[in-house]
Amino acid sequence: MAQSVPPGDIQTQPGTKIVFNAPYDDKHTYRIKVINSSARRIGYGIKTTNMKRLGVDPPCGVLDPKEAVLLAVSCDAFAFGQEDTNNDRITVEWTNTPDGAAKQFRREWFQGDGMVRRKNLPIEYNP
């Protein structure tokens, strides 16, 4: 069963952080790539620490081994310097899909006792 094997690695491009540059009076969109570098199909979900300011499209999906997806990370307009941005980040969560499951994302994959891995990508805002 897929859930007894820990999920393999993913890669993200960029690898360590996402950077948005001023001015912040307009919506910015930044593309990131998530690559399933493991030998198993995975389900992934993206979380943000600031739902008002940050959005991700698509927020979840399924990737076959070696498959990649391009995500659009958007930052809505905000008053730079007047809001706390220190803890802003995007978290990629992923888990192996059950053997024989259709290639359609299911939230319950993350709610059972299977192992879920996480990768944090901090957001940096340049003035």
Swiss-Prot record:
Q: What keywords are annotated for this sequence in UniProt?
A: Acetylation, Cell projection, Cytoplasm, Cytoskeleton
Q: Where in the cell is it found?
A: Cell projection, Pseudopodium; Cytoplasm, Cytoskeleton
Pfam families, per database record: Motile_Sperm
* Residues with N-acetylalanine modification: 2
Tissue expression from the record? Sperm.
Q: What does this protein do?
A: Central component in molecular interactions underlying sperm crawling. Forms an extensive filament system that extends from sperm villipoda, along the leading edge of the pseudopod.
Q: What is this protein called?
A: Major sperm protein 63
The organism named in the record is: Caenorhabditis elegans
Q: What gene makes this protein?
A: msp-63
